[in-house]
UniProtKB/Swiss-Prot annotation:
A motif (DEAD box) lies at residues 203-206. This is ATP-dependent RNA helicase SUB2. Its EC number is 3.6.4.13. Residues 81-256 form the Helicase ATP-binding domain. The keyword Nucleotide-binding applies. It comes from Chaetomium globosum (strain ATCC 6205 / CBS 148.51 / DSM 1962 / NBRC 6347 / NRRL 1970).
Amino acid sequence: MSGEEDLIDYSDDELNNETTAPASNGKKGDAAAAAQNVDKKGSYVGIHSTGFRDFLLKPELLRAIADCGFEHPSEVQQTCIPQAMLGGDIICQAKSGLGKTAVFVLTTLQQVEPVAGECSVLVMCHTRELAFQIRNEYNRFSKYMPDIKTGVFYGGTPIQKDAEVLKNKETHPHIIVGTPGRLNALVRDKHLRLGNVRMFVLDECDKMLDQIDMRRDVQEIFRATPQQKQVMMFSATLADEIKPICRKFMQNPTEHYVDEDTKLTLHGLQQYYIPLEEREKNRKLNELLDELQFNQVIIFVKSTIRATELDKLLRECNFPSIAVHSGVSQEERIRRYKEFKEFNKRICVATDVFGRGIDIERINLAINYDLPADADSYLHRVGRAGRFGTKGLAISFVNSDQDKEVLQQIEKRFEVALPEFPKEGIDASTYMAA
């Protein structure tokens, strides 16, 4: 068995250096027109149990949905769930916060037939935090399905513990969620056997398939699964260059582009920029945190060092801050993530490792202390605020010629004009829910 040092880890630098081409104009799925008044409630896009009876879901799933207080299916759920239930391969692009995770979680739970010691559903994503979150969604929706076991495997934890879980038929998960590096190591060392996988899911697929190392891991894992299986891929952004790569994993997939490219911005999210010098950032950030009303705020920076230093500075100024980045141990990252999600901290300083797919419903303010390198990264970052169609506020610091170019890319890509943040501030009612 190879040691921990053989595992590929994906650092913030690798994520930051990646460039993503603009996604093409999407086409609406045939069923998209059926979406009516989407009611966002609780910690997920609402879904009504009556609507799911139309999908012929198991009573156990309907009961869990009702317990969560969900009310209406979102457009992506109405579009994709019926197709996914038929067992066909699916590519789905829809903007952040509209319930893509629920599509594959509910679909796979509906179809899974648990056999002791066998994995029949494999879900991969690009960060440990997202894997942890997806596993929790499985636990939430399978609460009345006691025979279903779900496990999560990612780097930064002892691989021997994973091997012990997989060796025992009593603890071996039927549904496995994980990151490509750790899963590939488990397959390579013959701890994880995938000969019975029936459903293969990639969440934020473009992030994994656009990076050579991560794509290689995904391909190795894919080869270890049966040829006949259902493959589903999801993302908020999907560049033209990535779509042919996605299709290589599939057989005649149906493709669902729930929102057109220019509509990928988030409804209810107020977006502004502030021009300033690098040396002025800390003072301006302090002013904003003092003056703005918010439930929770996420502040994005470009490196782990800057995250650590800014978090330290904020705490010295008596702001309840926490930092999440790849520079801390995995156990500590998960602990901090849970602390922030459970509202024990109101301010989180993060790198792009926290910029995709993380659902924390109380975040209603996102600040780009450092502007990202491209429009796609901007969308994923500001999408942390205003999730589930709620109100939110995003403010970006712009201090270099490169920042100005990125700002122009964002405005051109999404056909919006980002105004300068007013010196007199803004009315809190425009971004705070009543």
